[in-house]
Amino acid sequence: MKTWAVVGLGNNPERAAYGVAKLLQDKGHRIIPVYPRAETVHGEIGYKTLAEIPGPVDVVDCFVNSTLVGKVVDEAIAIGAKAVWLQLDVIDHEAITRAQSAGLITVMDRCPAIEYRKKN
């Protein structure tokens, strides 16, 4: 899965999303920042919402509070994403169930950067 929309990715290098997105990009994935200010990050144009992204998205990676992630998951379903990835400490069992019912691959409370490091 090559195209990752990273929800919560802005230009703050102190935030986990910034480093994880860079690692994904370095591993050959296309990253798409999704952030209220729609910033360009790591050379990629940002969008305010998932619905604004032109073209298909494989994975929606969620760097948002658990109380907000249900809406993001519903947007991921609506745009036809193949998977949703809820980062460490982002927990919403109901949202994951909705995603699974819609046929999406789901990951919750894990970090792709950590998973990459485990493989290598």
PLM-predicted stretches and their roles:
Residues 5-7:
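Conserved beta-strand elements of the Class I
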Residues 41-44, 58, 94-97, 115-120:
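Short, charged, surface-exposed secondary-structure boundary motifs
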Residues 88-116:
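Rossmann-fold NAD(P)-binding glycine/threonine-rich loop
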Residues 14-15, 22-42:
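NAD(P)-binding Rossmann-fold cofactor-contacting core
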Residues 30-35, 44-45, 49-58:
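Helix-adjacent hinge/juxtasegments
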Residues 50, 54-93:
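Mid-chain, well-packed structural core segment of small domains
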Residues 1-3:
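Extreme N-terminal starter segment of soluble prokaryotic enzymes
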Residues 28-29, 81, 104:
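Short phosphate-binding/catalytic loops that engage adenosine nucleotides
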